[in-house]
């Protein structure tokens, strides 16, 4: 008969010494996996040959993405090995192909007698932002003229417009009756080129510690909405660009559909009406974000203009507003408010008159969100009389003040200005009313 274990007394159980904790607590599976992944990063940074660095880089990025998304790596090492090998080979292969293509490009430049774009001592970037078919490309002559005024020769700056690759990726003439869908057929490929171009600009700038003058003309959703461009190019621009000029092109959404159709007739690239209108919402919702993103930084020096492109083709757009960090001048309040109105359009419209939002949603009082943000973000906002180029009204640190009463009166015939004041500065409006 086995001996029975004597029972401990109540006092003994209450005052029993707690077991000593282990000096090295066991790691959870998740902790072990993340430690392993971080170790791959450390090994990659310390690697002294390109192959090892690429392998560790792929292990860190691929396994890190899986573990972050799923919470663990799973139990299929052969599958994980396969995708990491593919990732590393794609990375190394693309670099090798790029080096060989670079040799051919350099030979072609020499053979054709092209000029290489030199890095600039004080780099300037001009950027056009607007919805698809808003008329950005038609403004290039204006920007080229501005470059000349800044002392930059015609061949002294690079133009970034990846859309030209669509024509080179597809044989449009071979598409026959489906040629209107050509843009769709190459969308993913153009995105790949766009992304590679961003990385190329960054790598070249970091290598040379400089960057040439650039004119950027491209539409893409992440220009407004995502953080991808921030990760890839934002730091490059902040570090190397001295001055940035950004032009926001404001075009009525129904006009972009018409312009897009006419562009398709000439270039063979079409989009659905719904796509054009959807792009408008994306662009006009993103313009304020992009504006405030750059005005919140001290560098580079940042100059912006909002342009009303509802003018006949072949004529320069009208100035809506302009400014820099800390200051904004408004010439045409109605068009500035339109930026918010255009976010409410009907993407399923089948006729031009169906595009705009219902009348009650278009009232000034319901579309002051962007303007109120401007009041908070800019220390000084000036309203400029278009005839005399004189400031007649200012908002200084959120407070309205009349700068020229004689000029304010005729400008109050502008319904948008009067309704804005009725909402935000009713006392000033009543004081300015003729007695």
Language-model segments: residues:
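Conserved GTP-binding G-domain of TRAFAC-class P-loop NTPases and closely related GTPase folds
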Residues: 254, 258-434
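Conserved phosphate-donor/acceptor-positioning beta-strand/loop module used by diverse small-molecule
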Residues: 238-261
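Short glycine-/polar-rich loops that comprise or flank the Walker A/P-loop
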Residues: 155-157, 239-245, 267, 299-303
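Glycine-rich phosphate-binding P-loop
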Residues: 126-150
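Pre-Walker A adenine-sensing motif
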Residues: 106-120
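Long, basic/Gly/Ser/Thr-rich N-terminal segments
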Residues: 1-101
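Pre-Walker A (Motif I) flank of P-loop NTPase domains
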Residues: 121-126, 211-212
């Amino acid at each position: 008969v086995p001996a029975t274990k004597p029972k401990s007394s109540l006092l003994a159980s209450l005052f029993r010494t707690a077991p000593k904790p282990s000096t090295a607590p066991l790691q959870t599976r998740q902790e072990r996996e993340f430690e392993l992944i971080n170790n791959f990063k450390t090994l990659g940074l310390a690697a002294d040959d390109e192959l090892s660095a690429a392998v560790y880089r792929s292990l860190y990025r691929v396994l890190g993405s899986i573990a972050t998304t799923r919470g663990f790596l799973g139990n299929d090492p052969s599958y994980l090995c396969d995708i990491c090998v593919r990732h590393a080979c794609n990375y190394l292969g693309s670099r090798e192909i790029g080096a060989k293509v670079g040799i051919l490009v350099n030979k072609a430049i020499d053979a054709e007698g092209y000029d290489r774009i030199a890095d600039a001592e004080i780099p300037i970037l001009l950027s056009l932002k607007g919805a698809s078919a808003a008329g950005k490309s038609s403004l290039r002559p204006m920007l080229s003229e501005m470059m000349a005024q800044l002392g930059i020769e015609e061949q002294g700056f690079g133009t970034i417009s990846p859309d030209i690759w669509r024509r080179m990726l597809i044989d449009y003439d071979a598409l026959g009756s489906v040629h209107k869908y050509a843009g769709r057929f190459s969308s993913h490929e153009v995105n790949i080129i766009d992304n590679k171009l961003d990385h190329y600009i960054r790598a070249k700038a970091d290598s040379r510690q400089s960057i040439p003058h650039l004119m950027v003309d491209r539409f893409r959703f992440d220009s407004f909405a995502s953080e991808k461009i921030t990760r890839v190019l934002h730091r490059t621009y902040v570090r190397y660009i001295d001055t940035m000029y950004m032009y926001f092109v404001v075009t009525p959404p129904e006009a972009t559909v018409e312009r897009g159709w006419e562009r398709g007739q000439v270039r063979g690239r079409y989009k659905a009406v719904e796509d054009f209108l959807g792009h408008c919402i994306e662009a006009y919702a993103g313009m304020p974000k992009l504006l405030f993103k750059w005005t919140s930084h001290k560098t580079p020096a940042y100059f912006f203009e909002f342009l009303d492109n509802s003018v006949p083709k072949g004529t320069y757009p009208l100035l809506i507003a302009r400014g820099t960090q800390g200051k904004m001048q408004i010439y045409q309040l109605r068009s500035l408010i339109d930026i918010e109105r255009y976010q409410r359009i009907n993407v399923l419209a089948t006729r031009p008159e169906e595009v705009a939002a219902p009348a009650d949603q278009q009232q000034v009082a319901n579309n002051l969100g962007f303007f109120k943000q401007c009041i908070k973000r800019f220390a000084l906002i000036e309203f400029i009389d278009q005839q005399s180029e004189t400031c007649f009204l200012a908002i200084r640190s959120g407070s309205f003040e009349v700068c020229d009463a004689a000029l304010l009166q005729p400008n109050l015939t502008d319904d948008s200005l009067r309704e804005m004041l009725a909402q935000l500065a009713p006392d000033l409006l009543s004081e300015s009313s003729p007695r």
